[in-house]
């Protein structure tokens, strides 16, 4: 038994000594033959050799001789591998993006943040930024796994004052209805920072509803992220220009949800204003907000300074953050290194998702944090204790010396990404989805039997 890439010796008679004349299939898949002697063949287990039947064929001139299928089957063990869900690299970039089936949807442009619909876990949303180096996104896209379709759920022209949607979250009102919360980045202090959208039944989308009635609920500049606390319902959002974290209390968000309040809130000291909670560090710290599912703490991913902060929740709000991994460094300094705490190095840690680790069952924290390391072209794992390891990417070393590119296959040996940004986890089958920005694709990390190349 074993997985793809394992060495196998097949014993028999009259094999000869020329590997070019030998063909071996395992589970119907052709196995690379490394060497052969009269009584033994040395080969490598191919991918997707699920059924395990072993067949040997020998060529001799015009004749082809096939041995009987071996009575003993190879017990193939599936691997977790990287492949593509949808999208395509295109010189046109965003101009080639279109709605359509997974296998014909054009490019996926600048997928910077990904999350699931809270009421239908077959709908995966993608916030596409329309204003940075990875291209012009389309707004908020939907990957519909029921219908295997990609479509634009909220076009970028629906955003007031900015087309740079950076994050998506959801607020559940007192009546049990969900509202989409979208963080928008722009430079005018009087323009949009956060918008709210309502779920509207009907319409032409395959999922049977749309997100509409968009309205501005927060005005400020430089919002890089907006997130709802999972237990208090308060809204937290970031500010780039002054590196501040703001909070808007739940009752204010509830009033926007019900229509009681229509005037956007702005930073201030009043109870119903956007209150300053803390300062991350210096000016122009670009940081994403990733709140733990329990709400006990949040990671502030300081994208342009290449490190990650942790801020603990004291029951009322988040407290002064401290470094959990990486080192504050110049924004264009990208170093790749696994390690613990400040021994680890990143190249734009962009976004992340908390993933349950069965080995932590019963611990105070049962989650690892999987994150996209944008300029290191890798998916990294941050443990609760600050250990950083590389999960996927930077493979296929035989191609060239670059860590970036497009390659599917085994997590570390083969797979390559090119500026990954968004990431989501499907708890049902333990699958990871990655917004691979410069490959214009959504990549999938899961068991190979479940993956369509």
How should each PLM-predicted stretch be described?
Residues 1-84, 141, 205:
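Ser/Thr/Pro-rich low-complexity tracts
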């Amino acid at each position: 038994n074993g997985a793809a890439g394992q060495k196998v010796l097949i014993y028999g008679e009259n094999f000869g000594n020329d590997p070019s004349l030998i063909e071996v299939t395992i589970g119907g898949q052709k196995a690379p033959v490394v060497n052969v002697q009269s009584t033994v063949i040395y080969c490598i287990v191919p991918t997707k050799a699920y059924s395990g039947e072993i067949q040997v064929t020998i060529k001799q001139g015009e004749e082809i001789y096939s041995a009987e299928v071996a009575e003993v089957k190879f017990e193939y063990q599936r691997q977790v591998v990287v492949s593509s869900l949808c999208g395509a690299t295109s010189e046109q970039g965003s101009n080639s993006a279109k709605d359509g089936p997974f296998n014909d949807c054009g490019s996926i442009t600048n997928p910077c943040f990904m999350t699931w619909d809270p009421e239908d876990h077959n709908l995966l949303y993608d916030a596409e930024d329309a204003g940075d180096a990875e291209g012009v996104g389309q707004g908020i896209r939907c990957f519909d796994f029921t219908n295997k379709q990609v479509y634009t759920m909220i076009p970028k022209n629906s955003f007031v004052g900015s087309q740079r949607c950076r994050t998506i979250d959801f607020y559940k009102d007192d009546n049990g209805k969900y509202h989409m919360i979208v963080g928008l980045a722009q430079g005018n202090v009087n323009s949009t920072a956060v918008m709210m959208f309502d779920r509207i039944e009907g319409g032409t989308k395959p999922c049977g509803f749309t997100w509409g009635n968009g309205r501005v609920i927060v005005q400020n500049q430089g919002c890089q992220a907006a997130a709802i606390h999972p237990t208090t319902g308060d809204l937290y959002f970031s500010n780039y220009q002054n590196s501040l974290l703001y909070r808007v209390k739940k009752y204010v968000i509830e009033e926007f949800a019900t229509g009681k309040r229509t005037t956007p809130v702005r930073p201030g000291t009043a109870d119903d204003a956007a209150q300053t909670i803390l300062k991350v560090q210096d000016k122009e710290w670009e940081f994403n907000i990733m709140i733990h599912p329990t709400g006990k703490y949040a990671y502030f991913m300081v994208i342009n300074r290449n490190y990650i902060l942790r801020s603990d929740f004291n029951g009322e709000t988040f407290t002064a953050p401290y470094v959990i991994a990486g080192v504050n460094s110049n924004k264009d300094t990208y170093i790749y290194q696994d390690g613990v705490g400040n021994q680890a190095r990143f190249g734009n840690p962009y976004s992340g998702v908390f993933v349950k680790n069965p080995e932590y069952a019963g611990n105070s924290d049962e989650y690892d944090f999987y994150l996209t390391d944008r300029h290191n072209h890798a998916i990294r794992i941050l443990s609760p204790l600050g250990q950083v390891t590389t999960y996927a990417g930077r493979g296929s070393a035989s191609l060239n010396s670059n860590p970036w590119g497009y390659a599917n296959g085994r997590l570390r040996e083969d797979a390559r990404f090119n500026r990954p940004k968004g990431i989501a986890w499907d708890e049902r089958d333990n699958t990871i989805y990655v917004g691979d920005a410069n490959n214009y694709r959504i990549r999938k990390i899961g068991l190979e039997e479940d993956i369509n190349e």
